[in-house]
């Protein structure tokens, strides 16, 4: 079972990219579980046809210790297994702590057991690695390979670099490695070349360039992944390609994060700062 975590700055399209990629893997016949690690609890909506599923933390709050696995895992597109860790009530408690509680409970209830015959577990993790709780999939060896969703925008690249610092910190202890950058295009000038160069400097690869297409939003409005909504659309093939590249990937590295000056000079070199 491959344990994958998807990171990236808030609003970059992690949940969309994760779900569309998982749909591609499921279409290939892979058995996948998606664990949403975001208090917004939107990491599985498209796989479940728009169903806002009850989160692990909400279920725990209401049921106490009497939680069964079927209370917190739903079957989605092509038998993907979907669960959302959820978060505390706004203004109360620590969302990172909630992820730790949720993943531990999933383990106790046997969500990862061999009977489920899982090929992949995907963790869709909130924003930047800003606190220890959100770094938990990296830190505790829950995830073994990380993909960072980014774009040619400065803050997305800055966040990607910060996430690399987190991976570097825990690489020895947790055995986690960076599998590559996924460029979720924002149509920035020289975007593909810039992210390829960023990847090269960090010591990794740009595993796929996902072109911007409003069809992704149209599929989302219809509460589906692109592959589910219109399997013949060109954008569906982009996510199939990304799924295939992840499935075949053999490049796993300990990243070499850039100094801020290096990052800024990269932005200047490719014209974004002009």
Curated annotation (Swiss-Prot):
Keywords: 4Fe-4S, ADP-ribosylation, ATP-binding, Iron, Iron-sulfur, Metal-binding, Nitrogen fixation, Nucleotide-binding, Oxidoreductase. [4Fe-4S] cluster binds at residues 94, 131. SUPFAM superfamilies: P-loop containing nucleoside triphosphate hydrolases (SSF52540). Its EC number is 1.18.6.1. The modification ADP-ribosylarginine is found at residue 97. Disulfide bonds: none annotated. The keyword Cell membrane does not apply. ATP binds at residues 8-15. It catalyses: N2 + 8 reduced [2Fe-2S]-[ferredoxin] + 16 ATP + 16 H2O = H2 + 8 oxidized [2Fe-2S]-[ferredoxin] + 2 NH4(+) + 16 ADP + 16 phosphate + 6 H(+). Binds 1 [4Fe-4S] cluster per dimer. The reversible ADP-ribosylation of Arg-97 inactivates the nitrogenase reductase and regulates nitrogenase activity. One of its GO terms (molecular function) is nitrogenase activity. One of its GO terms (biological process) is nitrogen fixation. Its cofactor is [4Fe-4S] cluster. The key enzymatic reactions in nitrogen fixation are catalyzed by the nitrogenase complex, which has 2 components: the iron protein and the molybdenum-iron protein. Homodimer. Belongs to the NifH/BchL/ChlL family. This is Nitrogenase iron protein. It comes from Chlorobium luteolum (strain DSM 273 / BCRC 81028 / 2530). The lineage of its organism: Bacteria, Pseudomonadati, Chlorobiota, Chlorobiia, Chlorobiales.
């Amino acid at each position: 079972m491959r344990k994958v975590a998807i990171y990236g700055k808030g609003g970059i399209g992690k949940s969309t990219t994760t779900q569309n990629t998982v749909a591609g893997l499921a279409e290939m016949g892979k058995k996948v579980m998606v664990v949403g690690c975001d208090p917004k609890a939107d990491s599985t909506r498209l796989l479940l046809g728009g169903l806002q599923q009850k989160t692990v933390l909400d279920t725990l709050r209401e049921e106490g210790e009497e939680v069964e696995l079927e209370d917190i895992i739903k079957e989605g597109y092509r038998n993907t297994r979907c669960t959302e860790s959820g978060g505390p009530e706004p203004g109360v408690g620590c969302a990172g702590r909630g992820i730790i509680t949720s993943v531990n409970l999933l383990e106790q209830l046997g969500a990862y057991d061999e009977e489920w015959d899982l090929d992949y577990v995907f963790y869709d993790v909130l924003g930047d690695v800003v606190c220890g709780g959100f770094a938990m999939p990296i830190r505790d060896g829950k995830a073994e390979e990380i993909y960072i969703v980014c774009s040619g925008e400065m803050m997305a690249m800055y966040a990607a670099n910060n996430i690399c610092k987190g991976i570097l910190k825990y690489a020895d202890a947790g055995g986690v490695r960076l599998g590559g950058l996924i460029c979720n295009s924002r149509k920035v000038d020289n975007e593909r070349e810039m992210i390829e160069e960023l990847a090269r400097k960090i010591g990794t690869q740009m595993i796929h360039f996902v072109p911007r297409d409003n069809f992704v939003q149209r599929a989302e409005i219809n509460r589906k992944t692109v592959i589910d909504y219109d399997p013949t659309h060109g954008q569906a093939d982009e996510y199939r390609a990304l799924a295939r590249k992840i499935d075949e990937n053999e490049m796993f590295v300990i990243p070499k994060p850039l100094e801020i000056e290096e990052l800024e000079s990269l932005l200047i070199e490719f014209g974004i700062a002009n």
